[in-house]
Regions:
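Glycine-rich active-site loops that engage anionic ligands at enzyme catalytic sites
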Residues: 2-235
Length: 235
C-alpha cells in the first residue's frame, strides 16, 4: 500500500523522486529508485539514515535498514500512526542533502576464471569481449558499497563498467562458495559466506566479509570503497 507519492503528499514541499509505502504492520519503505543507480540519491539516503539515529527525529523508531535506492524504517505503530510516520519520513527526506561518507578503502586480491570463476567465459561471450578484457575492465575501477543486504555482510557494489553489464542468470545456483566474486546488471559483489546466487561468478577472493564474533560483524559498510586486484592472470 502506497502512503505517499508526489501527488498525494501533504507537505508544502514536494519531492517527485520519492515514494513511501507500507512494509508489513510496522515498517515504511522509502523508495527513490528512478532508473539507473544515482549516487547523489544514495548519499541523501545515507544522510537521512544518519538523521534517524537521533531518537528525537522520528517518534517510535525501532530500526533502519539502508538499501540501494531505498530505506526501510521499522517503527512502533502504537507511538505514531502510519500516516503520521510517513509524513515525518517525507519531511525528513525533503530536508536531506547528499552527504558523502568518508569510508575505508579496501584492496581485494582475486583469481579470475577457472573452477571458481565459471562464468567468466559466459560474460565475455555476452559482452563481446575477450576474457582478458573482462578482467582488465573489472579490475580497473573503484567500487563503492551502496548497501549491505541479502545475507550478513553482503555488499552491493556500484561502479561496474557498463560494458560488463549482463542480466542475472535465468536459473540461480543453489550454492556458491564464500569469496565468490559476482556481477549482474550494473552491480558487483563478493560473497561473505556460502549461499545461493543468481549472479555470474567470474572469480574468487580470500574474503572474510562477516564475523559474528567481531564488532561490527560486517567488514564493509556503506560508503566504503574497494578495488579488485588480479592475483593471477589467464595464460
Amino acid at each position: 500500500m502506497i502512503l505517499f507519492e508526489p501527488t498525494l503528499a501533504t507537505s508544502k514541499a514536494v519531492d517527485t523522486s520519492v515514494r513511501i509505502s507500507l512494509s508489513g504492520t510496522d515498517g515504511l519503505l522509502l523508495d527513490v529508485s528512478c532508473g539507473p543507480f544515482d549516487k547523489a540519491l544514495q548519499q541523501r539516503l545515507w544522510a537521512l539514515n544518519n538523521t534517524l539515529r537521533d531518537p528525537q527525529s522520528f517518534p517510535g523508531l525501532v530500526e533502519t535498514v539502508p538499501g540501494v535506492n531505498n530505506l526501510l524504517v521499522i517503527y512502533d505503530p502504537r507511538k505514531i500512526p502510519p500516516d503520521a510516520a510517513a509524513q515525518v519520513l517525507s519531511d525528513l527526506w525533503i530536508s536531506s542533502s547528499p552527504t558523502p561518507i568518508n569510508g575505508k578503502r579496501f584492496v581485494i586480491d582475486m583469481i579470475y576464471g577457472g573452477e571458481r570463476g565459471m562464468d567468466l567465459d559466459y560474460v565475455a561471450e555476452q559482452t563481446g569481449l575477450t576474457q582478458r578484457d573482462v578482467i582488465a575492465l573489472h579490475s580497473s575501477v573503484t567500487y563503492t558499497v551502496a548497501a549491505l543486504g541479502s545475507m550478513p555482510g553482503f555488499p552491493y557494489l556500484v561502479g561496474l563498467p557498463p560494458a560488463l553489464e549482463v542480466p542475472r542468470r535465468q536459473v540461480p545456483r543453489t550454492l556458491i562458495p564464500k569469496g565468490s566474486v559476482v556481477i549482474a546488471g550494473e552491480q558487483a559483489s563478493v560473497f561473505p559466506c556460502p549461499g545461493p546466487c543468481g549472479w555470474h561468478v567470474i572469480g574468487h577472493a580470500d574474503f572474510d566479509g562477516f564475523d559474528s564474533q567481531a564488532m561490527p560483524p560486517a567488514l564493509l559498510s556503506p560508503g566504503d570503497t574497494l578495488v579488485f586486484r588480479p592475483k593471477a592472470q589467464l595464460k
